[in-house]
């Protein structure tokens, strides 16, 4: 499909420039799966759209409820990017490659509908009903990224399962919806806890 082809074309263009014009510069590309986590309010993204529907008490429109996406918590993604940046600094020539960051467990394959159902269980606020519409453009039913290079070269793998990523994300947005919690403090505490987990696993 055009979406997937565009990603492959981007990698070909980066590789061509890296080898042809930037031979003295070491460039890596990084691509993550479908990222969820507190603090995201972008439009046309499933979790922010869900939170807006709760605030506005309006139906949530889902285009592809049965499509599977590689869901990943934002802290797992950022940790991977930091590891890649460190590797580029330490071993620039060998790190100048294309890296994917995504779940590597098939148990983490959640459909869009399953994500919403999981949030329904975790959020303390009632979720408005969902409306299903046909997508205007073709989209793949099943998207997955191969993160084996990041696993092998950066020793990276996601700390969170999809269920845990949903739990952490729902907790952050619960705090946001209550309007009585210091979100900066909550975010810093989440980062600190995440780093404690990574340090204990290393």
Spans of model-derived segments:
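Short-chain dehydrogenase/reductase
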Residues: 1-11, 44-48, 70-71, 109
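Flexible, glycine-rich beta-alpha linker
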Residues: 1-2, 23-46, 68
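Active-site Tyr-X1-5-Lys
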Residues: 1-31, 51-56
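A generic local structural motif
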Residues: 16, 47-48, 129-130
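Histidine kinase transmitter module recognition
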Residues: 20, 38-39, 91, 157
